[in-house]
């Protein structure tokens, strides 16, 4: 991707173009984000970056979230229109050993991914390759691999569903990676696990959800459809964090989901219930509001699969400009 290798000067030139047309810039800068606050101050452009989330303590590959928050607060106090995105959801992806994308940074897995899928089981059975892969995953680069936070999500062995690999490895008297490989080989690598990589520190997430100058977001927005699905974030936020944990008032939470992003992205007359605005409304039963579980469907071309969260309980009606809409009645909103 050109944006991954662009210099800061090139990025600033692009930001100036966006600012000239009253547009917004989104970027995923990993740990190199402090310069965004300087660019925003120089150009007057609104910028949002992903992601301000918690990671486990001791992760040498990541700047601690409190340090990132401190940089944000300093830039925000100086007047920079920079809005990091936060979320209530754990950062998780689906891991399959047939296509182990979360491990692709390890050289052993680059070697594996170069093979045809039919040839990959034999490499997993190669003890020398497996030892190399195991050592690479245990290195500092992959310090975020927490085997206790990798849960079996799809398997032909029903008794393993929901179990974490750390405890399974103990029972099997194996290294966690070896345990994962053995389980996956038993069902021809169709096993899938949910791999939680961060943002599961409840205390830290609570603080970030109320942090000034942040946007609720970090949705996958349809990318990586077979690995993750964050469509349930608004429902989880209202049900689990507002209703159950009381992190903020319902009124404040609704504004966080509606008015704040609408104002940031320039969606005029949207996001608030005011005279003259579009009557975009969601009628929900807060007492019974329940997030949808994820499920896998195979409705893409050539039988491709994706994850969906379409079984929410407690959403009674959706109105767009005052009119009830069907489930698939939406369209993209643009600034004017």
Show the residue positions of the predicted features.
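Intein/HINT protein-splicing elements and their conserved insertion hotspots or analogous self-processing inserts
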Residues: 326-336
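Short beta-alpha connecting loops at secondary-structure transitions
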Residues: 50-58, 223, 243, 296-307
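Glycine-rich tight-turn/loop motif centered on a GG-T
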Residues: 1-6, 23-27, 47-51, 193-194, ...
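Alpha-helix capping and helix-loop boundary segments enriched in small/acidic/polar residues
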Residues: 2-9, 27-28, 59-63, 225-229, ...
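Polyanionic/metal-chelating signatures
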Residues: 18-19, 33, 39-219, 230
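C-terminal helical cap
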Residues: 160-171, 176-206, 237-289
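Hydrophobic, small-residue-rich alpha-helical packing segments that form membrane-like cores
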Residues: 1-39
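C-terminal cap of metal-dependent C-N hydrolases
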Residues: 207-214, 231-233, 282-328
């Amino acid at each position: 991707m050109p944006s991954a290798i662009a210099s800061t000067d090139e990025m600033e030139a692009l930001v100036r173009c966006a600012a000239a047309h009253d547009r917004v810039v989104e970027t995923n800068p990993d740990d190199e984000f402090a310069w965004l606050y300087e660019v925003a101050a120089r150009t007057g452009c609104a910028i949002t970056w992903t992601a301000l989330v918690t990671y486990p303590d001791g992760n040498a590959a990541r700047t601690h979230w409190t340090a990132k928050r401190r940089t944000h607060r300093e830039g925000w106090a100086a007047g920079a229109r920079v809005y990091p995105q936060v979320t209530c959801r754990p950062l998780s992806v689906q891991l399959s050993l047939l296509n182990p994308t979360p491990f692709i940074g390890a050289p052993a897995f680059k070697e594996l991914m170069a093979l045809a899928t039919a040839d990959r089981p034999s490499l997993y059975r190669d003890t020398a390759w497996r030892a190399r892969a195991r050592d690479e995953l245990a290195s500092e680069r992959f310090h975020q691999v927490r085997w206790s936070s990798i849960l079996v999500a799809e398997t032909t062995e029903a008794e393993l569903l929901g179990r974490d690999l750390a405890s399974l490895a103990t029972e099997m008297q194996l290294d966690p990676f070896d345990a994962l490989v053995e389980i996956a080989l038993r069902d021809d690598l169709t096993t899938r696990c949910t791999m939680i990589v961060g943002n599961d520190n409840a205390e830290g997430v609570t603080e970030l959800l109320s942090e000034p100058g942040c946007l609720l977001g970090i949705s996958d927005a349809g990318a990586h459809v077979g690995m993750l699905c964050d469509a349930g974030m608004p429902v989880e936020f209202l049900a689990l964090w507002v209703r159950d944990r009381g992190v903020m008032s319902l009124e404040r939470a609704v504004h966080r989901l509606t008015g704040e992003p609408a104002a940031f992205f320039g969606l005029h007359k949207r996001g608030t219930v005011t005279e003259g605005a579009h009557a975009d409304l969601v009628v929900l039963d807060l007492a019974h509001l329940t997030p949808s579980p994820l499920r896998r469907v195979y409705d893409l071309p050539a039988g491709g699969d994706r994850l969906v969260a379409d079984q929410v309980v407690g959403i009674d009606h959706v109105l767009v400009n005052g009119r009830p809409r069907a489930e698939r009645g939406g369209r993209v909103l643009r600034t004017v």
